[in-house]
Amino acid sequence: MNKLHIKKGDTVYVNAGDYKGKIGCVLKVFLGKQRALVEGVNIISKTIKPSAKNPQGGFEKKEASIHISNLNVLDPKTGKPVRIGRKLGERGMLIRFSKKSGDEIK
Protein backbone atom coordinates (compact mmCIF):
# COMPACT_ATOMS: atom_id res chain seq x y z
CA MET A 1 0.00 0.00 0.00
CA ASN A 2 1.37 3.42 -0.95
CA LYS A 3 1.67 6.24 1.55
CA LEU A 4 -0.95 8.96 1.34
CA HIS A 5 -0.18 12.60 0.58
CA ILE A 6 -2.91 13.73 3.00
CA LYS A 7 -2.58 13.78 6.80
CA LYS A 8 -4.97 14.65 9.62
CA GLY A 9 -4.96 18.40 10.19
CA ASP A 10 -4.01 19.36 6.60
CA THR A 11 -5.94 22.14 4.90
CA VAL A 12 -7.10 20.74 1.59
CA TYR A 13 -8.80 21.87 -1.62
CA VAL A 14 -11.45 19.66 -3.28
CA ASN A 15 -10.52 19.46 -6.97
CA ALA A 16 -13.33 17.21 -8.29
CA GLY A 17 -16.91 16.18 -7.60
CA ASP A 18 -19.96 17.97 -6.25
CA TYR A 19 -17.89 19.96 -3.74
CA LYS A 20 -15.24 21.14 -6.22
CA GLY A 21 -13.62 24.37 -5.08
CA LYS A 22 -14.35 23.94 -1.37
CA ILE A 23 -11.59 24.20 1.24
CA GLY A 24 -11.60 22.33 4.54
CA CYS A 25 -9.49 20.70 7.23
CA VAL A 26 -8.92 16.92 7.25
CA LEU A 27 -10.57 15.40 10.33
CA LYS A 28 -9.66 11.74 9.78
CA VAL A 29 -7.89 9.59 7.18
CA PHE A 30 -8.92 6.01 6.35
CA LEU A 31 -5.73 4.34 5.08
CA GLY A 32 -7.22 1.07 3.80
CA LYS A 33 -9.99 2.75 1.84
CA GLN A 34 -7.87 5.74 0.70
CA ARG A 35 -10.56 8.15 1.85
CA ALA A 36 -10.60 11.18 4.14
CA LEU A 37 -13.15 13.05 6.23
CA VAL A 38 -12.99 16.77 5.41
CA GLU A 39 -14.69 19.42 7.53
CA GLY A 40 -17.70 20.96 5.73
CA VAL A 41 -17.44 18.72 2.65
CA ASN A 42 -19.77 15.89 1.52
CA ILE A 43 -22.47 16.55 4.16
CA ILE A 44 -25.11 13.81 4.50
CA SER A 45 -28.30 13.49 6.56
CA LYS A 46 -28.38 10.45 8.80
CA THR A 47 -31.65 9.22 10.32
CA ILE A 48 -31.63 8.83 14.11
CA LYS A 49 -34.07 6.34 15.63
CA PRO A 50 -35.97 7.38 18.76
CA SER A 51 -34.25 6.15 21.92
CA ALA A 52 -34.19 6.84 25.66
CA LYS A 53 -31.58 9.56 25.16
CA ASN A 54 -33.36 11.06 22.15
CA PRO A 55 -37.11 10.27 22.33
CA GLN A 56 -37.90 12.43 19.28
CA GLY A 57 -35.43 10.82 16.88
CA GLY A 58 -34.81 12.92 13.79
CA PHE A 59 -31.98 13.68 11.39
CA GLU A 60 -28.32 14.39 11.97
CA LYS A 61 -26.07 16.20 9.48
CA LYS A 62 -22.50 14.91 9.31
CA GLU A 63 -19.52 14.65 6.98
CA ALA A 64 -19.05 11.58 4.80
CA SER A 65 -15.65 10.51 3.50
CA ILE A 66 -14.26 11.61 0.14
CA HIS A 67 -11.60 9.83 -1.95
CA ILE A 68 -8.11 11.30 -1.53
CA SER A 69 -7.61 11.57 -5.31
CA ASN A 70 -10.14 14.42 -5.19
CA LEU A 71 -8.05 16.40 -2.67
CA ASN A 72 -5.00 18.65 -2.97
CA VAL A 73 -3.04 20.08 -0.04
CA LEU A 74 -2.87 23.88 0.07
CA ASP A 75 0.59 25.46 -0.18
CA PRO A 76 1.43 27.23 3.11
CA LYS A 77 3.17 30.05 1.23
CA THR A 78 0.70 30.84 -1.57
CA GLY A 79 -2.53 29.28 -0.28
CA LYS A 80 -3.10 27.53 -3.61
CA PRO A 81 -3.55 23.77 -4.21
CA VAL A 82 -0.26 22.03 -5.02
CA ARG A 83 1.22 18.59 -5.53
CA ILE A 84 3.24 17.08 -2.71
CA GLY A 85 6.72 15.57 -2.87
CA ARG A 86 8.77 13.74 -0.26
CA LYS A 87 12.48 13.99 0.49
CA LEU A 88 14.83 12.88 3.23
CA GLY A 89 15.37 15.49 5.90
CA GLU A 90 18.46 16.15 8.00
CA ARG A 91 17.53 13.53 10.58
CA GLY A 92 16.84 10.85 7.96
CA MET A 93 13.05 11.23 8.17
CA LEU A 94 10.81 11.89 5.17
CA ILE A 95 9.45 15.41 4.99
CA ARG A 96 6.66 16.60 2.72
CA PHE A 97 7.23 19.64 0.53
CA SER A 98 5.32 21.66 -2.04
CA LYS A 99 6.50 20.88 -5.57
CA LYS A 100 5.68 24.43 -6.69
CA SER A 101 7.31 26.59 -4.01
CA GLY A 102 9.61 24.01 -2.40
CA ASP A 103 8.37 24.91 1.11
CA GLU A 104 8.06 22.23 3.76
CA ILE A 105 4.51 21.18 4.67
CA LYS A 106 4.09 20.39 8.35
Swiss-Prot record:
Family: Belongs to the universal ribosomal protein uL24 family.
Family annotation (CDD domains): KOW_RPL26
Residue ranges of the TM segments: none
GO molecular function, one term: rRNA binding
GO CC list: ribonucleoprotein complex; ribosome
Biological function: One of two assembly initiator proteins, it binds directly to the 5'-end of the 23S rRNA, where it nucleates assembly of the 50S subunit. One of the proteins that surrounds the polypeptide exit tunnel on the outside of the subunit.
Keywords: Ribonucleoprotein, Ribosomal protein, RNA-binding, rRNA-binding
Pfam family, one: ribosomal_L24
Lineage: Bacteria, Pseudomonadati, Bacteroidota, Bacteroidia, Bacteroidales
Keyword Oxidoreductase: no
UniProt xrefs under InterPro entries: KOW, Rib_uL2_dom2, Ribosomal_uL24, Ribosomal_uL24_KOW, Translation_prot_SH3-like_sf
One of the protein's GO biological processes: translation
Oligomeric form and interacting partners: Part of the 50S ribosomal subunit.
Protein name: Large ribosomal subunit protein uL24
